[in-house]
Each structure stands twice: as structure tokens, then as C-alpha cells.
């Protein structure tokens, strides 16, 4: 995408590559821009922008900076305080906000942070607006048919208000609870909140639905978000589920837009498992619209084999829940997601929602009266080997004729027993080489073959 904004917002190390000044300028632009849009529509009420944040120490700094920018431009800032990314998307949509902002770096360590921008439909902000924000940050804004070297400041009664809007977060929790069509009474559930945004939401939702809820990593201190916790460090939840004799466990990331599960035996249930389980559940009930589950190119080869066996169609998008949702919206699909646990249920949400995902997995377990291990059993995950090759030129390495010939040779050798995927990293000088095959040795052999070709062509660093 642009200079600052990637597919998941403006992200960087707090105070280094993402500063309070950046956040202030984001607020200044958005407050001014949406007020201008309103004025052009003969609406003279101030723009309304809702803000949420995760538990990082720096999130407070960025929240205050955004509020300063928004109110200086005459917009009203509504604060959800610590909450999840999907809650901001939900409230932005149902409460008719001009846009929403989430302060989070998702699964990254505490010293990183990010600014995610959400439009009035609860979807990721259109790229053209993000590029205007970048232009303003860089002092070269041109919009509404003129250059804007400086933006006007609001004054007197036109300075924006700041509104405590924790009631919005509570209504989001009520919405989640309303989606629980079965009582969870008697079900022992473990939750790993990653010391992040879900710490003050997830347990309340499960308790309200009657579960016996056990929680780990729900004591945020500003520095421990995702620290050996949550969906990227699921081994802690695996141990917890087994030791406590729980029926199921759910692990969220820092802003709770993703979820992975642990079955009653301590096995990890990935995003691919979730797509398979819910896809089959929907098909059985005649509710899998278009008979299609949307995946990304990183989903496991075994998932597609399993879908073929069940007569379920699938689509593959580029990596990123942004691309998954775009395909779903365009083609009327009900479920899609990523192996990492970003799962989108388009009937209920416009973004990945970890807590919603866990509720849907509970629904399938209770409807089918089966433990998670049995629901996941038909999906045979193929062994996978992934190697990141640091290169001098990502595009040249991937387009090289000898490299392409090596990739083609592997694909032909695997046939319908596996697959090879070679792609550029979107954020690093890296080419990723991934092979899935019936056994680990075969994966490693073919990955090594392609990696050595890349290096022998002089692209390796």
C-alpha cells in the first residue's frame, strides 16, 4: 500500500517509527476531512469518531494524541477505552459514526503499536483516504480541488468534544451474548486473553451464557500484552486445558480479532480447522451460501482435500483478512478466514472477531453434541515446511527463470499429493518458500531445492 499504511493500518515501534505526532496528524486530518464531507452535504453537526485501544502502555499516549488532533479540527471523539478491534467496527457501523479508530498492533510485542482505521460501515478504511492521510503527514495534501499546506483549527464552541463511550463497548458485549443460541451451562471453558483487549470482555460474555469459565493472561500491565500468551503462544493454554480438565479452550491475540482453539485433549485447532468445522456445519443446515468457504493461499493443502471430500467449494485470496472480506462481500459468502485465526462470519460482523469465533465453535459443539477433537478429526493437516530467504531483490528473485523452473519441477513432482508456494513478504526483504506434502522429509527436500536455486542465482543475502 502506501508509505505508512499497510493492509492492517499504520504500525511501528512506538516512539520510533510511530510517534505521538503521527497520531495527532491522523486525528487532525480525519476530524477536518469528515467535517468537510458533512458541510458539503449541508450537515453542520460535528463529525463523530469512535476510538478504542488495547492494553499497551503507549496506547494511552496515542489515544490522547488522536483526541487532540480530532478536537482541534472540530470533531467529537468518543472513547470506548480498552476494547477489541471488532467492537470498534461494530459500534462505528451501528451507531452511525463517521469512522472508527483502533489503537493496537494486534499480536506484536508491547513496544510496537498501530493505528487501524475503520469506515462507517465497519470495514477497513478505503485506500484512497489512507493515502490522503499520508499526504497530510508528509505536508503535500491536495484534496477538494486545492492544496492544503495547513488545516484550519476549530475555535470557541466549534472545538470538538470528548465523550466517554464505554456504554458502546457494553452494548457490543450484549450483542455477542445475544448470538449465543445455546446455554453453555456445564461446559468448562478456558480463555487466554493475551493480557490484551479481551481481558475485560470475553469472560463476561461466557459467564453470561452460563459457562464455567477459567481465564489465564488477563492481568494487563501495559508491558505484558502477547508476552508468552495468547494465540501466538498457545502452548500455555494447551497445558492449562489439560491440567484443569477443561472441555475447550480459546486463545485470542492482543486486539482479539483472531482466535485459535485447544480441544479437550490439548490439541491446537487452527483457523483452517475452524473454517472446516463451521463450513461443514453450515452445509449440513443448508446455510452455506454459494457453497463456498473463503481461504487464503496460506491455508493448508489438507483443508482443500477435506472440502473436496465434503463437496464444499472454496476460494483462495491473497494473505490478509482485508482480501478475504473483500471477496466475501463481492460474492455473497458467509464464512472465510485465515489459518492464523482471523475468521469472518459475514452475517454477524464485518471483520475478524475472536470472541465471536469462539461462540460459533461452542455453537457447533453443542448443536452436534460432539467434543472439538471429534469435530476436527476428519481434517488431516499436511506437514508443512516454510523457509524465509533474505534476498537483495524480492521481485527479481521470484521472477528469475531458473527459480521458476525449480518451482515448476517441484509442483510437477508433487502432483496432487501436495503443493509449493513461493511468495514475496509484504514487509521484509524476504521470499517465502513453503511446501506441503504427505511427510516432513519430502517437504524439506523440495524447500531446500528451491532455496538453493535462489541462492545460487545470486539473490541471497
Question: What are the language-model segments listed below?
Answer:
Residues 80, 131-173, 178, 264-337, ...:
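Proline/glycine-rich low-complexity loops and linkers
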Amino acid at each position: 500500500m502506501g508509505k505508512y499504511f499497510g493492509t492492517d493500518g499504520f504500525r511501528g515501534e512506538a516512539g520510533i517509527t510511530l510517534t505521538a505526532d503521527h497520531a495527532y496528524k491522523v486525528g487532525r486530518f480525519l476530524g477536518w476531512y469528515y467535517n468537510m464531507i458533512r458541510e458539503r452535504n449541508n450537515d453542520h453537526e460535528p463529525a463523530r469518531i469512535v476510538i478504542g485501544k488495547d492494553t499497551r502502555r503507549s496506547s494511552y499516549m496515542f489515544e490522547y494524541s488522536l483526541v487532540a488532533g480530532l478536537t482541534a479540527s472540530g470533531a467529537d471523539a468518543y472513547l470506548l477505552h480498552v476494547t477489541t478491534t471488532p467492537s470498534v467496527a461494530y459500534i462505528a457501523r451501528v451507531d452511525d459514526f463517521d469512522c472508527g479508530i483502533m489503537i493496537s498492533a494486534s499480536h506484536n510485542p508491547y513496544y510496537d503499536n498501530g493505528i487501524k482505521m475503520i469506515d462507517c460501515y465497519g470495514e477497513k478504511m478505503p485506500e484512497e483516504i489512507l493515502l490522503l492521510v499520508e499526504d497530510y503527514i508528509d505536508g503535500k495534501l491536495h484534496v477538494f480541488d486545492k492544496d492544503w499546506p495547513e488545516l484550519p483549527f476549530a475555535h470557541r464552541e466549534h472545538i470538538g468534544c470528548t465523550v466517554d463511550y464505554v456504554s458502546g463497548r457494553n452494548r457490543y458485549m450484549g450483542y455477542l451474548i445475544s448470538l449465543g443460541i445455546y446455554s453453555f451451562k456445564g461446559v468448562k471453558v478456558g480463555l487466554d486473553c493475551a493480557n490484551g483487549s479481551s481481558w475485560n470482555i470475553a469472560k463476561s460474555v461466557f459467564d453470561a451464557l452460563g459457562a464455567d469459565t477459567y481465564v489465564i493472561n488477563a492481568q494487563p500491565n501495559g508491558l505484558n500484552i502477547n508476552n508468552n500468551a495468547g494465540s501466538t503462544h498457545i502452548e500455555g493454554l494447551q497445558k492449562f486445558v489439560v491440567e484443569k480438565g477443561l472441555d475447550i479452550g480459546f486463545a485470542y491475540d492482543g486486539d482479539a480479532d483472531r482466535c485459535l482453539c485447544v480441544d479437550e485433549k490439548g490439541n491446537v485447532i487452527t483457523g483452517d480447522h475452524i473454517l472446516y468445522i463451521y463450513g461443514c456445519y453450515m452445509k449440513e443446515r443448508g446455510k452455506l451460501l454459494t457453497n463456498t468457504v473463503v481461504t487464503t493461499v496460506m491455508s493448508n493443502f489438507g483443508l482443500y482435500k477435506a472440502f473436496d471430500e465434503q463437496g464444499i467449494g472454496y476460494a483462495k485470496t491473497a494473505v490478509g483478512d482485508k482480501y478475504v472480506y473483500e471477496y466475501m462481500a463481492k460474492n455473497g459468502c458467509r464464512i472465510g478466514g485465515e489459518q492464523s485465526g482471523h475468521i469472518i462470519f459475514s452475517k454477524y460482523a464485518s471483520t475478524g472477531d475472536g470472541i465471536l469465533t469462539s461462540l460459533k465453535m461452542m455453537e457447533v459443539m453443542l448443536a452436534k453434541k460432539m467434543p472439538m477433537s471429534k469435530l476436527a478429526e476428519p481434517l488431516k493437516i499436511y506437514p508443512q515446511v516454510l523457509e524465509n530467504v533474505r534476498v537483495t531483490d524480492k521481485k527479481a528473485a521470484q521472477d528469475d527463470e531458473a527459480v521458476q523452473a525449480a518451482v515448476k519441477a517441484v509442483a510437477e513432482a508433487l502432483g496432487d499429493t501436495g503443493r509449493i508456494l513461493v511468495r514475496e513478504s509484504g514487509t521484509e526483504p524476504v521470499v517465502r518458500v513453503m511446501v506441503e506434502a504427505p511427510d516432513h522429509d519430502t517437504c524439506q527436500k523440495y524447500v531446500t531445492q528451491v532455496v538453493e536455486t535462489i541462492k545460487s542465482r545470486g539473490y541471497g543475502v
